[in-house]
């Protein structure tokens, strides 16, 4: 368990990597790894709720994943539908908001409708937010925000010289949630793969060799304890963070 809740992260983001390697290691077809990964999400969501995490954002399908073999993409879309169906009763029971970010235009009308229904049914919950990134890319997110700001300028609602970081950020995904405190990537790779590029500006980064289907609450707790022990300066000196004067 987490040793202290004094400086708990409010927002954790996870790149859920390693499903295919898990399948190969266990003699399973590719789909078996993705199914195991889907099933692994449930206990971690409940654990995050139990320890007081305010928001959990998971990278389920990137904008680049459309380049994968067609049969794998079709399987992933089916599993995403199943994930929404599986998560919704749990979200309603625990009063967790279920949300989705990403380019919905690339998704089927059926999947979009399922996602919208789940969001509407859980929109009023404030205990915790589970955000699933589908057909998402950080660069897409930033370009989309640029378009929204450009429209405001074109309409005369905002001048180019007056644009602030806050003006821009409010058009990004997750603008109403705390900035990401912890970014975790499972599966052994050391990159963030175009995930929440703006929102992770000051996130503490954690990488693990553990494949996503084998990533458990105990390892998450170890990472959170390390996070709590880190000094987050946000550009300041250690003395400023500690409130010391000389």
Residue ranges, per PLM feature:
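Flexible, compositionally biased loop and terminal segments
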Residues: 1-246
């Amino acid at each position: 368990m987490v040793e202290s809740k004094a400086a708990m992260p409010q927002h954790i983001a996870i790149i859920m990597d390693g499903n295919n390697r898990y399948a190969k290691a266990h003699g399973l077809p590719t789909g078996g790894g993705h199914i195991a990964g889907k099933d692994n999400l449930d206990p971690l969501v409940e654990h995050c709720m139990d320890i007081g995490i305010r928001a959990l954002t998971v990278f389920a399908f990137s904008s680049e994943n459309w380049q994968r073999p067609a049969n794998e993409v079709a399987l992933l879309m089916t599993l995403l539908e199943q994930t929404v169906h599986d998560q919704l009763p749990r979200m309603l029971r625990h009063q967790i908001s279920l949300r989705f970010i990403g380019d919905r235009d690339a998704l089927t009308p059926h999947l979009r409708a399922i996602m919208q229904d789940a969001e509407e049914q859980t929109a009023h919950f404030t205990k915790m937010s589970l955000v699933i990134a589908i057909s998402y890319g950080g660069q897409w997110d930033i370009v989309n925000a640029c378009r929204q700001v450009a429209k405001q300028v074109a309409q005369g609602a905002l001048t180019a010289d007056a644009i602030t970081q806050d003006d821009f950020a409010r058009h990004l995904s997750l603008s109403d949630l705390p900035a990401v405190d912890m970014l975790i990537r499972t599966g052994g790779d050391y990159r963030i793969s175009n995930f929440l590029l703006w929102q992770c500006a000051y996130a503490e980064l954690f990488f693990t060799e553990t494949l996503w289907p084998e990533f458990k609450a105990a390892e998450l707790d170890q990472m959170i304890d390390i996070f709590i022990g880190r000094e987050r300066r946000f550009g300041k000196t250690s003395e400023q963070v500690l409130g010391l004067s000389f």
